[in-house]
């Protein structure tokens, strides 16, 4: 009985904490879009390793993958 109560309390805390989180880094309630992330990235650098970004550019993933568009901006020529 005590274990069930403890699990219930922990789940309730998790629900409350998750509900209080805001949807975006800027503090709004809407979800960030890819365009929002691109606009907020002012510096031109690659977050991923050089070889990873080079592979993404070689395989033309810079145009199709949001992951590489954000993390390989310099190599992909997006800034």
UniProtKB/Swiss-Prot annotation:
Disulfide bonds join 44-79, 53-72, 62-76. SUPFAM superfamilies: Crisp domain-like. Belongs to the sea anemone type 1 potassium channel toxin family. Type 1b subfamily. It is found in: Secreted; Nematocyst. Coiled coil: none annotated. It comes from the Eukaryota. Keywords: Disulfide bond, Ion channel impairing toxin, Nematocyst, Neurotoxin, Potassium channel impairing toxin, Secreted, Signal, Toxin, Voltage-gated potassium channel impairing toxin. Inhibits voltage-gated potassium channels (Kv1/KCNA). Residues 20-37 form a propeptide. GO terms for molecular function: potassium channel regulator activity; toxin activity. Residues 44-79 form the ShKT domain. GO terms for cellular component: extracellular region; nematocyst. InterPro entries: ShKT_dom (IPR003582). Residues 67-68 are annotated as: Crucial for binding to potassium channels. Its main location: secreted. This is U-actitoxin-Avd9d. Residues 1-19 form the signal peptide.
